[in-house]
Amino acid sequence: MTNHSVILCILDGWGNSENSQFNAIAQSYKPCWDNTILQYPKSQLITHGLNVGLPDGQIGNSEVGHVNLGSGRIVLQDLCKINNEIKYIKNNRYLLEFIKKIKQNNGICHIAGLLSDGGVHSLHTHMLDIIDTLSNFQIQIAVHIFLDGRDTPPISAIKYINILREHIKHLNNVNIATISGRYYSMDRDNKLDRTRTAYKAMAFADAKRYTDPSLAIQDSYNAGITDEFILPCVIGDYNGMNPQDGFIMTNFRSDRAIQIIKMIIGDIKTDNHITLENTIGMVKYSESINIPCLFPNNNITNTLGEVIANHKLHQLRIAETEKYAHVTFFFNGGREDTFENEDRIIIPSPSVTTYNLMPEMSAKEVTNTVIERIKLQKYSLIILNYANADMVGHTGNIEATKQAITALDQCLNKILNCIQGTNYVLVITADHGNAEEMFDVKNNMPYTAHTLNPVPFIICNYSKQIRLKNGRLCDVAPTILEILNIEKPKEMTGISLIEYI
């Protein structure tokens, strides 16, 4: 091993695009960045489709990006795995056991999930396939719909409602029970008041009632509320859950499923509570959630974090709340426990309704803490995530996103200044694009989703003369190991992108 240490700085949602129109990054004031891309070796990384273990053409996301970054290999993602296996769902032993308990208890089945073709947290066809299988067992099914508007256009929910209604129109035992914007039903930031609002509608039918989901959605549109933020409401004569019922979550991404599931199974209590013990998920969401899953996860070994730990080196993971799981759980390939000599720091995200109201988020606090830890000269590897470009980009507010980019630029400048004269090498990249495309010209509305654009890959303050090849996210870990002069394990099929001059 050499005396080099590495800081991997992940600029979440920072993509490259030659088109400056509606590009918050290109239009922002960022003198440090502009100088950095001229001064240091740079290339680009692919973040979508087959190159990250997703279906061809599927937009990448933060979970997928961090799994690939940390694993050093293309990891087959849950979306692909479920697409391959759901055709056999009627024979799935976990689902059959779930159904058996419902029938024994004379309960109904509650099925909930994000009704979206975004492919980030869910895929609507998975829900439809499971509904078909459940309906064949002659049990009553209540569907709880989470509305997207973030990985899909902000005003598109009625399209997906109509797809569902067309699919179930001949199924007399299936009814839409509630709808809720994902802002409430899929919070991950411990803003439990949001989760409780969704839970009360689902568990007790305690929300405004509509005869038709499309009417509820249109009412929200008329009030200027887009899909993501639609208040939970009850549909038709739905009257709530009972303890003998079953609950199935069709989201396959864990971070935004955890809070609502913990409320359903009673791990997070409310003033009034109904606990559904017969609960099942698509995947293993967390070691702290003890429920079965339809599609068990594969174990990923010899990730970057594990290799660092095996060499008895110290490492640090740091991010604000919104991205903390990404630099820990996801970066470690789905492992919740820390490795030996792995420190973790979570900086609270600001308590605001949406992050366009505070574009700087907690980047300054993250930066100050990182600088304190750099000065300790303790860590061989520091992994940090800046959430701003992604989280503010998701609001669709280009002016706020430009402010977020400027705030990030100031943070990068502080870190670069801090490592001058040290053995730290700063590796800058992103997990996917977002902030470089802020408007959907085709639909004439703000663009709030991720992009298919490549992301930057820059190496700063390295003592050797190099150039960088273009690559994929899975090539980042092998590149870092080369800088650290650590042999790449055989499980890592990515390659180092360094070419020595």
Curated annotation (Swiss-Prot):
Q: In which pathway does it act?
A: Carbohydrate degradation; glycolysis; pyruvate from D-glyceraldehyde 3-phosphate: step 3/5
Q: Which GO cellular component term is one of those annotated?
A: cytosol
SUPFAM superfamilies linked to this entry? 2,3-Bisphosphoglycerate-independent phosphoglycerate mutase, substrate-binding domain, Alkaline phosphatase-like
UniProt KW keywords: Glycolysis, Isomerase, Manganese, Metal-binding
Family annotation (CDD domains): iPGM (cd16010)
- Gene3D superfamilies per record: Alkaline Phosphatase, subunit A (3.40.720.10), BPG-independent phosphoglycerate mutase, domain B (3.40.1450.10)
Query: Which top EC class is named for this enzyme in its record?
Result: isomerase
Bound cofactor: record note = Binds 2 manganese ions per subunit.
Task: Recall the GO molecular function terms of this protein's record.
Answer: manganese ion binding; phosphoglycerate mutase activity
Name the active site residues.
62 (phosphoserine intermediate)
Which residues make up the binding site for substrate?
121, 150-151, 182, 188, 253-256, 323
Report residues binding Mn(2+) 1.
390, 394, 450
Q: Name one GO biological process term.
A: glucose catabolic process
* Signal peptide (from-to): none
The question of whether Isomerase is a record keyword is answered with yes
Does Metal-binding count among this protein's keywords?
yes
Q: Which reaction does it catalyse?
A: (2R)-2-phosphoglycerate = (2R)-3-phosphoglycerate
The UniProt function text for this chain reads: Catalyzes the interconversion of 2-phosphoglycerate and 3-phosphoglycerate.
Family of this protein: Belongs to the BPG-independent phosphoglycerate mutase family.
Query: Quaternary arrangement and interactors, per the entry?
Result: Monomer.
What this protein is called in its record is 2,3-bisphosphoglycerate-independent phosphoglycerate mutase
UniProt source species: Ehrlichia chaffeensis (strain ATCC CRL-10679 / Arkansas)
**Taxonomic lineage of this organism?**
Bacteria, Pseudomonadati, Pseudomonadota, Alphaproteobacteria, Rickettsiales
